[in-house]
């Protein structure tokens, strides 16, 4: 995922995040698919999750492997929930605009 190259300057941190992504990619997509209505939304959720993980790299580097996996699961789930809430808000605004016409 190219996001590592743009968000993380440190080579070791970038390698760590790449490993986290590779080890958890299928899991992240599986969780995101439970909340997404299409493939593009699923990819957006995973991308947003990876971005959040990169921002918290100092915190997650200190986690043991089992805790790291749980952290990733919760991060994807929370990102997906926030994504759905945001989509619902957008749809509500669109509906209000169309009702005003």
Locate each region found by the language model:
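Arg/Lys-rich amphipathic alpha helix in sigma70-family domain 2
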Residues: 59, 73-95
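Structural recognition of an alpha-helix C-terminal capping motif at a helix-to-coil junction
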Residues: 30, 44-51, 55, 66-78
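N-terminal module of bacterial RNA polymerase sigma factors
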Residues: 1-27, 34, 55-57
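Membrane-interface starts of transmembrane alpha-helices
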Residues: 38-42
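Short alpha-helix-to-loop micro-motif enriched in aromatics/charged/Gly
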Residues: 58-64
């Amino acid at each position: 995922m190219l996001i590592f190259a743009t968000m993380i300057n440190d080579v070791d941190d970038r390698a760590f995040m790449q490993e986290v992504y590779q080890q958890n990619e299928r899991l992240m997509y599986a969780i995101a698919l439970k909340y997404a209505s299409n493939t593009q939304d699923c990819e957006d959720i995973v991308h947003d999750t990876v971005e959040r993980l990169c921002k918290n790299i100092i915190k997650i580097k200190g986690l043991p492997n089992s805790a790291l996996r749980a952290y990733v699961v919760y991060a994807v789930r929370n990102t997906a929930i926030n994504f759905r809430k945001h989509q619902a808000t957008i749809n509500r605004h669109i509906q209000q605009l169309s009702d005003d016409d």
